[in-house]
């Protein structure tokens, strides 16, 4: 038994060194490191199948969101929907969002943030301009090339016991690369325009461009403007950051005229976390049921935690905020720490709306800090709305990472976030979302909010 354990550890060390040895010389994230797992994170067949089918559901949700916004503008759905989604946006951006040229355009990369809780999956938000495409592509490629006889998998408690032999990562070695390439159709040249705000992701996108090969993909600074007819642009910058992308106006004009292909489209509605609050709003249930279909409608409600838009508009004295039984958002400050299993976060169109910025877990804050966050959310409603979301604590998983300093495998109890990447190819109703790969971020058990950090393990997922 001792000899077998030692042999297993030697094999794990070998795999971890192999992974580290494949790191591109330019790195993947500027100034960011993570813990290396010797194995993929194993989901089990049932969860893997759930993720494979989830892309269809989320694409249909985006279609429904797009339609809801348009119908709200036309007066065929409640006017307050568009009014809330438009809060804080400049008129030029709203004009683009409402332009006939972009009428049916949807993001072609869909990445949900999923937590594995004791009650199943929880989708906390959707990202239409996600980082991690290159990282996940590199992880898939690297772990697919581990020595076949040694492959194993880290797994969460619901997974079957891992066996020796081949464990294929979800999406395969090149699923992320082929998926990303597919979203640009027949474009001969694709310009990936990266803002300074997103500059940390430049190395991973440069790696993607190099792997796809040739001169098809080009990494461009925000000042780049030499676009040719028939080319495509991948917008790797958030819409709040347009002031720092000097030629964003030209990009949008060329896309509107049909001279270039642009994704994601210049539609801030898809960068708003309040979409989940609209999903939960009972006034809109019939719309969602009709546009999603009963099966997808029910699945979204199983996955999405209850979400509220923190709108300080006065309620009638006999009315209350659903589920919370509060008659005024100021009363949110009076909840006990135990009652504050709630996440408060900026909805969108803000430098604080991505990553772990602008995210407050009520049960993890003092009364004073929680009160300050609530006051800020109420005060900023007109130009930077916030949402409140029920917090479902991720369950514990067993993981391990390799300590290169001490040359040993370190077991770790952790909590995991799954980020599947869906790539949408095809046009209009023929468009389909394909799963390219799944990134697991495993943070130590004492971390309440899961995000990329030096103490986190990044690993691709296998079934």
Q: Where is each model-derived feature located?
A:
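Preference for protein termini
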Residues: 1-463
